[in-house]
Protein backbone atom coordinates (compact mmCIF):
# COMPACT_ATOMS: atom_id res chain seq x y z
CA UNK A 1 0.00 0.00 0.00
CA UNK A 2 1.03 3.66 0.15
CA UNK A 3 2.91 3.00 3.40
CA UNK A 4 4.94 0.10 2.06
CA UNK A 5 2.87 -2.70 3.61
CA UNK A 6 2.39 -5.91 1.68
CA UNK A 7 -1.01 -7.34 2.57
CA UNK A 8 -3.05 -10.35 1.53
CA UNK A 9 -6.11 -8.98 -0.28
CA UNK A 10 -7.48 -12.31 -1.46
CA UNK A 11 -10.13 -12.38 1.28
CA UNK A 12 -11.23 -8.85 0.45
CA UNK A 13 -11.44 -9.71 -3.24
CA UNK A 14 -13.46 -12.82 -2.46
CA UNK A 15 -15.98 -10.82 -0.42
CA UNK A 16 -16.18 -8.20 -3.16
CA UNK A 17 -16.93 -10.85 -5.77
CA UNK A 18 -19.81 -12.13 -3.65
CA UNK A 19 -21.51 -8.79 -4.36
CA UNK A 20 -20.88 -9.12 -8.12
CA UNK A 21 -18.44 -6.20 -7.99
CA UNK A 22 -15.19 -5.85 -9.92
CA UNK A 23 -11.74 -5.26 -8.47
CA UNK A 24 -9.05 -3.02 -9.96
CA UNK A 25 -5.56 -3.09 -8.45
CA UNK A 26 -2.73 -0.57 -8.81
CA UNK A 27 0.49 -2.57 -8.46
CA UNK A 28 4.23 -1.94 -8.59
CA UNK A 29 5.51 -3.92 -11.58
CA UNK A 30 8.87 -4.76 -10.06
CA UNK A 31 7.30 -6.08 -6.86
CA UNK A 32 5.28 -8.57 -8.91
CA UNK A 33 8.50 -10.39 -9.75
CA UNK A 34 8.39 -11.64 -6.14
CA UNK A 35 4.77 -11.23 -5.06
CA UNK A 36 1.70 -13.08 -6.31
CA UNK A 37 0.27 -11.10 -9.26
CA UNK A 38 -3.23 -9.58 -8.86
CA UNK A 39 -4.77 -12.00 -11.35
CA UNK A 40 -3.85 -14.95 -9.13
CA UNK A 41 -5.89 -13.59 -6.22
CA UNK A 42 -8.91 -12.61 -8.28
CA UNK A 43 -8.41 -9.03 -9.48
CA UNK A 44 -10.22 -8.14 -12.72
CA UNK A 45 -7.94 -5.27 -13.75
CA UNK A 46 -4.36 -4.33 -12.86
CA UNK A 47 -2.79 -0.96 -13.63
CA UNK A 48 0.43 0.81 -12.79
CA UNK A 49 3.56 2.59 -13.94
CA UNK A 50 6.44 1.09 -15.94
CA UNK A 51 9.06 3.63 -14.80
CA UNK A 52 10.93 1.07 -12.72
CA UNK A 53 11.75 -0.89 -15.85
CA UNK A 54 14.74 1.17 -16.91
CA UNK A 55 13.06 4.54 -17.46
CA UNK A 56 14.63 7.66 -15.86
CA UNK A 57 12.57 9.56 -13.29
CA UNK A 58 12.53 12.67 -15.50
CA UNK A 59 11.28 14.97 -12.69
CA UNK A 60 8.24 12.72 -12.28
CA UNK A 61 7.43 11.91 -15.89
CA UNK A 62 6.52 11.19 -18.55
CA UNK A 63 6.29 7.45 -18.02
CA UNK A 64 4.26 4.77 -19.74
CA UNK A 65 1.51 3.02 -17.81
CA UNK A 66 0.54 -0.62 -18.01
CA UNK A 67 -2.99 -1.98 -18.11
CA UNK A 68 -4.01 -5.62 -17.85
CA UNK A 69 -7.38 -7.30 -17.48
CA UNK A 70 -9.11 -10.65 -17.63
CA UNK A 71 -10.51 -12.06 -20.85
CA UNK A 72 -13.98 -10.81 -19.83
CA UNK A 73 -12.99 -7.21 -20.52
CA UNK A 74 -10.84 -7.56 -23.63
CA UNK A 75 -13.44 -5.96 -25.92
CA UNK A 76 -13.73 -2.92 -23.67
CA UNK A 77 -10.02 -2.15 -23.75
CA UNK A 78 -9.12 1.10 -25.52
CA UNK A 79 -6.35 1.07 -28.08
CA UNK A 80 -4.93 -1.56 -30.38
CA UNK A 81 -4.26 -4.98 -28.89
CA UNK A 82 -1.45 -7.01 -30.44
CA UNK A 83 -1.83 -10.78 -30.47
CA UNK A 84 0.28 -13.78 -31.46
CA UNK A 85 -0.51 -15.52 -34.73
CA UNK A 86 1.19 -17.51 -37.50
CA UNK A 87 2.29 -16.09 -40.86
CA UNK A 88 1.88 -17.81 -44.25
CA UNK A 89 5.20 -19.59 -43.77
CA UNK A 90 4.12 -21.06 -40.44
CA UNK A 91 6.32 -18.74 -38.39
CA UNK A 92 5.23 -17.13 -35.14
CA UNK A 93 4.08 -13.57 -35.85
CA UNK A 94 2.64 -10.60 -34.00
CA UNK A 95 -0.41 -8.97 -35.51
CA UNK A 96 -3.09 -6.46 -34.61
CA UNK A 97 -5.76 -8.61 -33.00
CA UNK A 98 -8.31 -6.26 -31.44
CA UNK A 99 -9.13 -2.60 -31.83
CA UNK A 100 -12.79 -2.76 -30.87
CA UNK A 101 -12.86 0.57 -29.06
CA UNK A 102 -10.75 2.61 -31.46
CA UNK A 103 -12.21 5.85 -32.80
CA UNK A 104 -12.20 4.70 -36.43
CA UNK A 105 -14.13 1.55 -35.48
CA UNK A 106 -16.82 2.66 -33.04
CA UNK A 107 -16.55 6.47 -33.14
CA UNK A 108 -19.19 7.63 -30.66
CA UNK A 109 -18.69 4.50 -28.54
CA UNK A 110 -14.90 4.62 -28.65
CA UNK A 111 -12.95 4.57 -25.41
CA UNK A 112 -9.64 5.61 -26.95
CA UNK A 113 -10.29 9.32 -27.40
CA UNK A 114 -7.14 10.22 -25.50
CA UNK A 115 -4.72 11.62 -28.04
CA UNK A 116 -1.44 11.17 -26.20
CA UNK A 117 0.85 8.17 -26.14
CA UNK A 118 4.06 7.18 -24.41
CA UNK A 119 5.23 4.70 -27.03
CA UNK A 120 8.93 5.55 -26.62
CA UNK A 121 8.76 5.07 -22.85
CA UNK A 122 6.75 1.87 -23.29
CA UNK A 123 9.39 0.53 -25.69
CA UNK A 124 12.16 1.43 -23.23
CA UNK A 125 10.41 -0.46 -20.43
CA UNK A 126 9.66 -3.41 -22.71
CA UNK A 127 13.26 -3.68 -23.88
CA UNK A 128 14.48 -3.46 -20.27
CA UNK A 129 12.32 -6.50 -19.51
CA UNK A 130 13.51 -8.33 -22.65
CA UNK A 131 17.17 -7.53 -21.95
CA UNK A 132 17.11 -8.79 -18.35
CA UNK A 133 14.61 -11.60 -18.88
CA UNK A 134 12.42 -13.15 -16.16
CA UNK A 135 15.35 -14.34 -14.04
CA UNK A 136 17.15 -11.00 -14.30
CA UNK A 137 14.04 -9.03 -13.32
CA UNK A 138 13.55 -11.38 -10.37
CA UNK A 139 17.16 -10.83 -9.29
CA UNK A 140 16.73 -7.05 -9.48
CA UNK A 141 13.56 -7.23 -7.39
CA UNK A 142 15.21 -9.56 -4.87
CA UNK A 143 18.18 -7.23 -4.47
CA UNK A 144 15.89 -4.26 -3.75
CA UNK A 145 14.03 -6.33 -1.16
CA UNK A 146 17.28 -7.56 0.40
CA UNK A 147 18.44 -3.96 0.80
CA UNK A 148 15.18 -3.10 2.54
CA UNK A 149 15.45 -6.20 4.73
CA UNK A 150 18.97 -5.28 5.83
CA UNK A 151 17.86 -1.78 6.82
CA UNK A 152 14.70 -3.12 8.48
CA UNK A 153 16.68 -5.54 10.64
CA UNK A 154 19.21 -2.90 11.68
CA UNK A 155 16.57 -0.31 12.59
CA UNK A 156 14.50 -2.89 14.48
CA UNK A 157 17.54 -4.07 16.47
CA UNK A 158 18.30 -0.45 17.35
CA UNK A 159 14.83 -0.04 18.86
CA UNK A 160 13.10 1.92 16.11
CA UNK A 161 9.36 1.37 15.63
CA UNK A 162 8.67 0.06 12.12
CA UNK A 163 5.02 -0.20 11.15
CA UNK A 164 5.35 -2.60 8.22
CA UNK A 165 6.78 -6.03 8.95
CA UNK A 166 5.70 -7.34 5.54
CA UNK A 167 7.14 -5.19 2.75
CA UNK A 168 8.81 -5.23 -0.63
CA UNK A 169 11.15 -2.24 -0.76
CA UNK A 170 9.60 0.50 1.42
CA UNK A 171 9.90 0.92 5.19
CA UNK A 172 7.93 3.22 7.48
CA UNK A 173 9.48 4.34 10.76
CA UNK A 174 7.52 6.21 13.44
CA UNK A 175 9.55 8.90 15.21
CA UNK A 176 9.02 11.76 17.68
CA UNK A 177 8.73 15.10 15.86
CA UNK A 178 12.03 16.39 17.25
CA UNK A 179 13.98 13.33 16.09
CA UNK A 180 12.19 13.38 12.75
CA UNK A 181 13.18 17.02 12.21
CA UNK A 182 16.81 16.23 13.06
CA UNK A 183 16.96 13.29 10.64
CA UNK A 184 15.28 15.34 7.92
CA UNK A 185 17.80 18.16 8.29
CA UNK A 186 20.76 15.77 8.09
CA UNK A 187 19.26 13.79 5.21
CA UNK A 188 18.58 16.86 3.10
CA UNK A 189 22.10 18.15 3.80
CA UNK A 190 23.43 14.82 2.53
CA UNK A 191 21.21 14.92 -0.58
CA UNK A 192 19.11 11.96 0.57
CA UNK A 193 15.36 12.14 -0.07
CA UNK A 194 12.82 10.43 2.17
CA UNK A 195 9.04 10.79 2.40
CA UNK A 196 7.99 12.58 5.57
CA UNK A 197 4.77 12.45 7.54
CA UNK A 198 4.01 14.29 10.78
CA UNK A 199 5.38 11.53 13.00
CA UNK A 200 6.94 9.10 10.55
CA UNK A 201 9.38 8.76 7.68
CA UNK A 202 9.19 6.37 4.74
CA UNK A 203 12.28 5.03 3.01
CA UNK A 204 12.08 3.38 -0.41
CA UNK A 205 15.09 1.36 -1.55
CA UNK A 206 14.99 0.77 -5.28
CA UNK A 207 17.20 -1.04 -7.76
CA UNK A 208 19.67 1.86 -7.94
CA UNK A 209 20.58 1.82 -4.24
CA UNK A 210 24.16 0.79 -3.44
CA UNK A 211 25.81 -0.55 -0.28
CA UNK A 212 27.28 2.92 0.22
CA UNK A 213 23.82 4.49 0.02
CA UNK A 214 22.61 2.03 2.62
CA UNK A 215 25.56 2.87 4.87
CA UNK A 216 24.79 6.59 4.61
CA UNK A 217 21.17 5.98 5.58
CA UNK A 218 22.38 3.96 8.56
CA UNK A 219 24.56 6.89 9.66
CA UNK A 220 21.51 9.19 9.67
CA UNK A 221 19.73 6.84 12.07
CA UNK A 222 22.92 6.06 14.02
CA UNK A 223 22.73 2.35 13.23
CA UNK A 224 25.22 -0.08 11.76
CA UNK A 225 23.92 -2.33 9.01
CA UNK A 226 23.87 -5.95 10.17
CA UNK A 227 23.68 -7.35 6.66
CA UNK A 228 25.35 -6.29 3.42
CA UNK A 229 24.25 -7.22 -0.09
PLM regions and their residue ranges:
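Generic recognition of stable, solvent-exposed alpha-helical segments in well-folded globular domains
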Residues: 4-7, 11, 25, 29-33, ...
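Conserved PLP cofactor-binding pocket of PLP-dependent enzymes
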Residues: 165, 190-202, 228
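Short amphipathic beta-strand starts and helix->beta connectors
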Residues: 151-159, 185-196
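Short amphipathic alpha-helices in soluble, non-transmembrane regions
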Residues: 182-190, 216-221
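Conserved PLP-binding catalytic core of the aspartate aminotransferase-like
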Residues: 158-188, 205-208
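Active-site C-terminal subdomain of aminotransferase-like
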Residues: 52-158, 162-165
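Flexible inter-domain linker/hinge segments
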Residues: 211-229
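Conserved PLP-enzyme active-site core in the AAT-like
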Residues: 1-93, 155-159, 172-173, 185
Amino acid sequence: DCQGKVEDYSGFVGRTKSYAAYVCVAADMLSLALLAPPGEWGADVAVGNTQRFGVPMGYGGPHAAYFACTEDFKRQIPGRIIGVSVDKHGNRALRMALQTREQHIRREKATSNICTAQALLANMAAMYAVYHGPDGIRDIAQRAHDMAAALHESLKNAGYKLTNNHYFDTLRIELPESQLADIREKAEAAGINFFYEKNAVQIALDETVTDQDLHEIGVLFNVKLTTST
